[in-house]
């Protein structure tokens, strides 16, 4: 690795990670500091060349130095962890019951960050027992295979009359977000983290009548990388089973 003469965030030999976002810096979202939703956003390995090459150049403002002692394996997982850090901060989860729909890597990390941010209780759901076992290994005690038991029934047993107040859609399928909308408490928030291959058909009447809020979550910003590194370094978020 080589660094330009003006670079101060790292030096040759340092272990680093970097955000893959390429942003314009000139559009309104960028000017507001919301460059994760840049009007001209490109992502390396998608709309721009990736990093599977011997040498490539990145701007220093995308670089985050890894702390001493953090393995490169964990360093490679900071990117998805930052997705979890960002999504879990899109609404206030402290003291609230939470359901995370989808127990893949991102859903697992969203659930872990919700716990870290003070959620009262977190239930994670999926159709895969393997993914749910991984969630339990990561410290998410309450899991549900929705092919074996309905969410409504399980949530009632787990949360009682209090219900749950925050849902995270991390599966990317219509049945998932519809289930959240139909079982969450009125006046609650649903954060959409997944990328849907097909737009779901949702009841706007139900949304309005129950005064639900659908909140988008797009990738991350620099501070989310820093939060992810901090929580992983302190053992608050467990990457080892992943």
Could you say what each language-model-derived stretch is?
Residues 17, 165-168:
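N-terminal Rossmann-like NAD(P) cofactor-binding module of classical short-chain dehydrogenase/reductase
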Residues 188-189:
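Glycine-centered, small-residue-biased loops immediately flanking beta-strands
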Residues 1-28, 67-69:
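Glycine-rich beta-strand-centered segment in the early N-terminal region that forms part
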Residues 70-149, 153:
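Mid-domain Rossmann-like dinucleotide-binding core that forms the NAD(H)/NADP(H) cofactor-binding site
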Residues 153-161, 197-242:
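C-terminal substrate-binding/catalytic core of Rossmann-like NAD(P)-dependent dehydrogenases/reductases
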Residues 184-185:
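Helix-to-beta-strand junctions that scaffold the AdoMet/dcAdoMet cofactor pocket
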Residues 193-194:
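Acidic carboxylate diad motif detector
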Residues 24-101:
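NAD(P)H dinucleotide-binding glycine-rich loop of Rossmann-like/cofactor-binding domains
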């Amino acid at each position: 690795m080589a660094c330009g003469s003006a670079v101060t965030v790292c030096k040759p030999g340092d272990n680093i990670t970097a955000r893959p976002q390429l942003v314009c810096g000139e559009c309104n979202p960028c000017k507001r500091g919301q460059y994760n939703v840049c009007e001209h956003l490109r992502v390396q390995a998608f709309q721009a060349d990736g990093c599977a090459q011997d040498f490539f150049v990145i701007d220093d403002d995308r670089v985050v130095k890894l702390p001493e002692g953090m393995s490169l394996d964990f360093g490679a997982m900071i990117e998805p962890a930052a997705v979890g850090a960002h999504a879990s901060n899109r609404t206030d989860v402290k003291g609230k019951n939470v359901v995370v729909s989808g127990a893949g890597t991102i859903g697992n990390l969203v659930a872990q960050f919700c716990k870290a941010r003070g959620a009262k209780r977190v239930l994670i759901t999926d159709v895969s027992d393997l993914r749910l076992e991984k969630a339990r290994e990561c410290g998410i005690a309450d899991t549900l295979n929705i092919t074996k038991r309905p969410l409504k029934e399980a949530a009632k047993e787990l949360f009682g009359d209090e219900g749950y107040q925050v849902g995270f859609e991390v599966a990317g399928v219509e049945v998932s977000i519809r289930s959240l909308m139909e079982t969450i408490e009125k006046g609650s928030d649903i954060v959409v983290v997944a990328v849907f291959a097909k737009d779901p058909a949702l009841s706007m009447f139900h949304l309005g009548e129950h005064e639900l809020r659908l909140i988008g979550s797009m990738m991350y910003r620099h501070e989310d990388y820093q939060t992810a590194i901090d929580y992983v370094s302190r053992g608050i978020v467990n990457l080892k089973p992943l």
